Amino acid sequence: HEPCGESCVFIPCITTVVGCSCKNKVCYD
């Protein structure tokens, strides 16, 4: 799992549309 370059502390991951998910306040693929 690689970081998607996005955090999800205050807002959800926009990168969920490309298969990323929130883990420990960071978006991972």
Swiss-Prot record:
Instruction: Name the source's superkingdom.
Output: Eukaryota
Q: Keyword Zinc: yes or no?
A: no
Protein modification: Contains 3 disulfide bonds.
Q: Which residues form the signal peptide?
A: none
Q: Has the keyword Membrane been applied to this entry? A: no
User: Renumbered to this chain, where is the cross-link Cyclopeptide (His-Asp)?
Assistant: H1-D29
Q: Sorted alphabetically, which keywords does the UniProt record give?
A: Disulfide bond, Knottin, Plant defense
Enumerate the Pfam families for this protein.
Cyclotide
GO BP of this protein: defense response
- InterPro entries documented for this protein: Cyclotide, Cyclotide_bracelet_CS, Cyclotide_sf
Q: Which cysteines are cross-linked by disulfides?
A: C4-C20, C8-C22, C13-C27
Q: What does this protein do?
A: Probably participates in a plant defense mechanism.
Q: Which family does it belong to?
A: Belongs to the cyclotide family. Bracelet subfamily.
Q: What is known of its domains?
A: The presence of a 'disulfide through disulfide knot' structurally defines this protein as a knottin.
* Name of this protein: Cyclotide cter-L
